[in-house]
From Swiss-Prot:
Official protein name in the record: Polypeptide N-acetylgalactosaminyltransferase 2
Protein's UniProt keywords contain Transferase: yes
Region (Disordered): 54-81
Record remark: domains: There are two conserved domains in the glycosyltransferase region: the N-terminal domain (domain A, also called GT1 motif), which is probably involved in manganese coordination and substrate binding and the C-terminal domain (domain B, also called Gal/GalNAc-T motif), which is probably involved in catalytic reaction and UDP-Gal binding. The ricin B-type lectin domain binds to GalNAc and contributes to the glycopeptide specificity.
EC number(s) on file: 2.4.1.41
Pathway: Protein modification; protein glycosylation
Swiss-Prot/TrEMBL catalytic activity: L-seryl-[protein] + UDP-N-acetyl-alpha-D-galactosamine = a 3-O-[N-acetyl-alpha-D-galactosaminyl]-L-seryl-[protein] + UDP + H(+); L-threonyl-[protein] + UDP-N-acetyl-alpha-D-galactosamine = a 3-O-[N-acetyl-alpha-D-galactosaminyl]-L-threonyl-[protein] + UDP + H(+)
Lumenal side: 26-633
Region (Catalytic subdomain A): 201-306
GO biological process terms, semicolon-separated: protein O-linked glycosylation; protein O-linked glycosylation via threonine
The species this protein was found in: Drosophila melanogaster (Fruit fly)
Compartments, as annotated in UniProt: Golgi apparatus membrane
Length: 633
């Protein structure tokens, strides 16, 4: 008897532990609401509440179960209850008016019919939220269905033994192992967490373009938008699939509430894909995001508030870092702004000490930035259209952030980074996709278009920094110049003086070639740092024979300077990184001598076949020391 009592007590204790554990696990489980499909009863009720009784009756007939012989169900075939749709639901992404006209032209995805919304339906003012019929009723009551996250990611998983970096240039294995709604640290300043935002914020259309993106990363981007944004502020997510190898990467995501998918029928590149998404968007505010980001807590409200207060503001979040190796989320400094050097390559730079001191009392204030990174920003749609959208003749990727930054500032707008908005971004060391013609040529072409339209005479500083860019055709820019005139945009000099005074114009310098005997020219011979230079027949096209003679006496080829190796007669002259040292200073003398400014040695080509151009005792009688510097013949 005593043993039975002990056994009963023991079993009871075990049962209590089991119940406590089960209760905790069930209550602590957080719903991933972003992966909801469309809720049956709620959606239908919303539609009926907003319709007249006659329209509701008509609609009820049209909502007949698929396979019932009439309405959209018939158009969809046996989608309602057949083997293709185990759930028994037909989910429609389309306009009410299209639906009521029985104009059901859709794409069946595992029992789901996805329809593009039409502008007529969206503006009609009927139907559920945003003019949509989110879900067709079935016999399943109010049960909510969820997107099959595991199945979606598994279909794009790595093959056995496949390098996890090969497809996306980041560790896809690490990304696939993470849930779409993983927790990330709140990296905002504590003062941001107490800020209140106005209640009349506009809703936004989020535009995400992608090409062969890892499924787990793309899904995590979408989930972070939906889970960490107030539901009423996200009108839609417009996914623009830039002709990915597998159309299902995007089409499967059309099952998720608020997600629309547009697929290009050929590769268009970032710029044209974004414009296509913007044109299709229905909200008055556009939010552009990359396809490998994670939005942080309350990321959207501070951005929308700044645009609501002034539609000419273009605003960006602080961009946190997501490790390409293990996907760790790392907070970035909020004391950064975007800038560039004269090579027109974007860079992050710290605010000046005085600016940081001014922000000490309120680190939540907006930061004016001369340049945006380009991947993540919010802009008023009407203002985006007025400004000329993007330069549609730019290809693939690169330079578009430069162009839109110049255009916004010079044409009456402003760029801001909002410290209380945080979005993480996977930064990679290389692009995962190919560029027709090569990435360098595409970037140079796009950058030249921006420089030729917006930089006026200051574009020469770009060509001095990147001489090879002048060999890349940039196409016709007449339409962009006409836009600049139409908008009465300010000159680049104004931009330097009022927006980016820290970018100092380089010292004046002449660019040309050093000739000898009228037929031979000083040439790098294809060498780079620590390489010798020689002479080669002049070809008058720049390249290896293009030199800049600066006011300080440097003889430069790109970022390399002619450098005297030793202060002695017979010393080699080589290319080294310009460092403003005495070894790199030269003077042009009468008679064509190129003399070192400190000792009496001059550039001499007598031994160029053995050791390249060297520094010999100056003698104007020697033809090997006579040079002329000037423009190309």
């Amino acid at each position: 008897m005593r043993r039975n009592i002990k056994l009963i007590v023991f079993v009871s204790i075990i049962w209590m532990f089991v119940m406590v554990y089960y209760f905790q696990s069930s209550t602590e489980k957080v719903e991933n609401r972003a992966l909801r499909l469309r809720e049956v009863a709620t959606a239908m009720q919303q539609y009926q509440d907003d319709s007249s009784s006659a329209a509701a009756a008509s609609t009820a007939r049209q909502w007949a179960p698929a396979g019932g012989g009439a309405g959209p169900g018939a158009a969809a075939g046996a989608a309602g209850s057949g083997a293709d749709d185990p759930g028994g639901n037909v989910i429609l992404i389309g306009s009410v008016k299209d639906f009521e006209r029985n104009a059901v032209h859709g794409l069946k995805l595992n029992g789901i019919v996805a329809l593009e919304e039409t502008s007529q339906g969206l503006s009609g003012g009927t139907g559920g939220p945003g003019g949509r019929l989110p879900v067709a009723p079935s016999g399943r009551g109010t049960e909510v269905e969820y997107f099959n996250e595991a199945g979606y990611i598994r279909a794009g998983a790595l093959r056995n033994g496949e390098d996890p970096y090969i497809r996306n240039r980041f560790n896809q294995e690490a990304s696939d192992a993470l849930p779409s709604n993983r927790d990330i640290p709140d990296t905002r300043n504590p003062m941001c967490r107490t800020k209140k935002y106005r209640e009349d914020l506009p809703e936004t259309s989020v535009i995400i373009t992608f090409h062969n993106e890892a499924r787990s990363t793309l899904l995590r981007t979408i989930v972070s938008v939906l889970n960490r944004s107030p539901e009423h502020l996200i009108r839609e997510i417009v996914l623009v699939d830039d002709y990915s190898d597998h159309p299902e990467d995007g089409l499967e995501l059309a099952k998720i509430d608020k997600v629309r998918v547009i697929r290009n029928d050929k590769r268009e590149g970032l710029v044209r894909s974004r414009v296509k998404g913007a044109d299709a968007a229905v909200s008055s505010v556009l939010t552009f995001l990359d396809s490998h980001v994670e939005c942080n807590e309350m990321w959207l409200e501070p951005l929308l508030e700044r645009v609501r207060e002034d539609p000419t503001r273009v605003v960006c979040p602080v961009i946190d870092v997501i490790s390409m190796d293990n996907f760790q989320y790392i907070g970035a400094s909020a004391d950064l702004r975007g800038g560039f050097d004269w090579n027109l390559i974007f860079k992050w730079e710290y605010l000046s000490p005085s600016e940081r001191a001014m922000r000490h009392n309120d680190p939540t204030t907006a930061i004016r930035t001369p340049m945006i990174a380009g991947g993540l920003f919010v802009i008023d749609k009407a203002y985006f259209n007025k400004l000329g959208k993007y330069d549609m003749k730019m290809d693939v990727w690169g330079g578009e952030n430069l162009e839109i930054s110049f255009r916004v500032w010079q044409c009456g707008g402003s760029l801001e980074i909002i410290p209380c908005s945080r979005v993480g971004h996977v930064f990679r060391k290389r692009h995962p996709y190919t560029f027709p013609g090569g990435s360098g040529n595409v970037f140079a072409r796009n950058t030249r278009r921006a420089a030729e339209v917006w930089m006026d005479d200051y574009k020469q500083h770009y060509y001095n920094a990147v001489p090879l860019a002048k060999n890349i055709p940039f196409g016709n820019i007449d339409d962009r110049l006409a836009l600049k005139e139409k908008l009465h945009c300010k000159p680049f000099k104004w931009y330097l003086e009022n927006v980016y005074p820290d970018l100092q114009a380089p010292d004046p310098q002449e660019v040309g070639q050093f000739r000898q005997d009228s037929t031979e020219c000083l040439d790098t011979m294809g060498h780079l740092i620590d390489g010798t230079v020689g002479i080669f027949p002049c070809h008058n096209t720049g390249g290896n024979q293009e030199w800049a003679f600066t006011k300080r006496g440097e003889i430069k080829h790109d970022d390399l300077c002619l450098t005297l190796v030793t202060f002695a007669r017979g010393s080699q002259v080589v290319l080294k990184a310009c460092d403003d040292s005495e070894n790199q200073r030269w003077i042009m003398r009468e008679g064509g001598l190129v003399r070192h400014y400190k000792i009496n040695v001059c550039l001499d080509s007598r031994d160029q076949s053995q050791q390249g151009v060297s520094a010999q005792h100056c003698n104007s009688a020697l033809g090997t020391q006579r040079w002329s510097f000037g423009k190309y013949a």
